[in-house]
């Protein structure tokens, strides 16, 4: 009987060895295979084309329907408005017709005193028959076909100013490099200011601005050279806001300049020039010219 028990024991041990050998040949279960592949090494995504890949939702576009729509900003060039007291409307009407015809050939952009412009003109004495000049607009003057503007720039330490006729046939292009306003309607005092306020790179690139955006106002105040100046800019009749008078004049000189002050002129209603009706009539002429 002992021999039978020993034979059965050895048979059971042989069967267990054969079973373990068979398990090593079989493929592992799916759960074990997943645990093996999901190790510390992270699989790289093949991109959004892979089925089931995560795609972020599009950003919502929020439209405020209660916000009032900003009206289109219209600009009427100042040379279209005749001077006060002129009583010959036919002459100005004929001039405006010629001005509108010229604007169909040459694009005259919106610009103000303080804007930086680049003007290209025909020059028979230049190598390429054209010349360019970049500078800051320091003054706009004249009415009708005689409208002019002055550009100023400091080149090699020397101040250079060129007065361009706005409707001159030699003007080929007027490019606004930087559109902005200043605190004053005339910047002729830059002639007496430090050169750094009139120095601009001739290769300056244009500054992009939205079409309906308000024109920015540059509140820069310049420092002046020591006296004498070309004019007495400190006197109230010039009404200059863009000069640091506290750095170049004493308190006694400022009090002396106030002797020429005429504060009653601010309340003189006869000096006001209402151009609303004239502007409305001119806009009708401009719209009719665009349709023709």
Curated annotation (Swiss-Prot):
InterPro entries in UniProt: Ribosomal_bL19, Ribosomal_bL19_sf, Translation_prot_SH3-like_sf
Compartment(s) of residence: Mitochondrion
Main localization (coarse): mitochondrion
Assembly: Component of the mitochondrial large ribosomal subunit (mt-LSU). Mature mammalian 55S mitochondrial ribosomes consist of a small (28S) and a large (39S) subunit. The 28S small subunit contains a 12S ribosomal RNA (12S mt-rRNA) and 30 different proteins. The 39S large subunit contains a 16S rRNA (16S mt-rRNA), a copy of mitochondrial valine transfer RNA (mt-tRNA(Val)), which plays an integral structural role, and 52 different proteins.
Residues with PTM Phosphoserine: 77
Name of protein: Large ribosomal subunit protein bL19m
Pfam families named among the record's database cross-references: Ribosomal_L19
Originating gene: MRPL19
Gene Ontology terms: cellular component: mitochondrial inner membrane; mitochondrial large ribosomal subunit; mitochondrion; nucleus
Record's keyword annotation contains DNA-binding: no
Protein's GO biological process: mitochondrial translation
């Amino acid at each position: 009987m002992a021999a039978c028990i020993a034979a059965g024991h050895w048979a059971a041990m042989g069967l267990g060895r054969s079973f373990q050998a068979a398990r090593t040949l079989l493929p592992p279960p799916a759960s074990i295979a997943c645990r093996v592949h999901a190790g510390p090494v992270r699989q790289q995504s093949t991109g959004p084309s892979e089925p089931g890949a995560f795609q972020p939702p599009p950003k919502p576009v929020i439209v405020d329907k209660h916000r009032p729509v900003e009206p289109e900003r219209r600009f009427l060039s100042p040379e279209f408005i005749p001077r006060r007291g002129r009583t010959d409307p036919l002459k100005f009407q004929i001039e405006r017709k010629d001005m509108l015809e010229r604007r169909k050939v040459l694009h005259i952009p919106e610009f103000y005193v303080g804007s930086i412009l680049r003007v290209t003109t025909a020059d028979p004495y230049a190598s390429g028959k054209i010349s360019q000049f970049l500078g800051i607009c320091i003054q706009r003057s004249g009415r009708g076909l005689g409208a002019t503007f002055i550009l100023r720039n400091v080149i090699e330490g020397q101040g250079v100013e060129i007065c361009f006729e706005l409707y001159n046939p030699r003007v080929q292009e007027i490019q606004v490099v930087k559109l902005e306003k200043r605190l004053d309607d005339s910047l002729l005092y830059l002639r007496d200011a430090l050169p750094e306020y009139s120095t601009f790179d001739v290769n300056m690139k244009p500054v992009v601005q939205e079409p309906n955006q308000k024109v920015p106002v540059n509140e820069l105040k310049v420092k002046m050279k020591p006296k004498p100046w070309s004019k007495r800019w400190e006197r109230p009749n010039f009404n200059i806001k863009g000069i640091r008078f506290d750095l170049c004049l004493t308190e006694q000189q400022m009090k002396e300049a106030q002797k020429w002050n005429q504060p009653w002129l601010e309340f003189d209603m006869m000096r006001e020039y209402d151009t609303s009706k004239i502007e409305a009539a001119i806009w009708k002429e401009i719209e009719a010219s665009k349709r023709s």
